[in-house]
């Protein structure tokens, strides 16, 4: 196992924690597309047709979860990996207007269904992955944008789009060569969530499964 992930397994990482690359103003999220969608987006520095804003689009702050999802850019329709820098204000707007895809234990089912129906944003917490796609004992957030949220993402939040596909191929080859790829990965750190947003998305406040 690569060094960083062996260490993380031994640490008390909160069960649900947002880890990301971010600055004071921006956070990087990842998406993978077919070249027909990715190439125009990189050229325009925003998502343009054939990107379909009427469909829910999922953004992922975890680079390695994106690699798990796209199979290191080898899955059909996901062969171009994009790093999308968006405003932290926009990202936190999405979290504040979100609903968990599945209710947590103890949630009032009627209240959850009402929020699910009204919210343009879905939150899922899935097992984080190491570079070899092995599940880690804590979760990574995926944020699904639809309706008003998808429009805001496409039109207002994006600060830049970078094609990472060549870098992804380099890391994939290093893995196949049996190398430790820790130093080749984007640096990610815990994202500071205001308490209200942490409650909305169901983030953990302690390193346990709660």
Model-based region annotation:
Residues 24-64, 70-75:
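Glycine-rich loop/turn
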Residues 2-27, 52-55, 72-210:
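Conserved NAD+-utilizing ADP-ribose enzyme module
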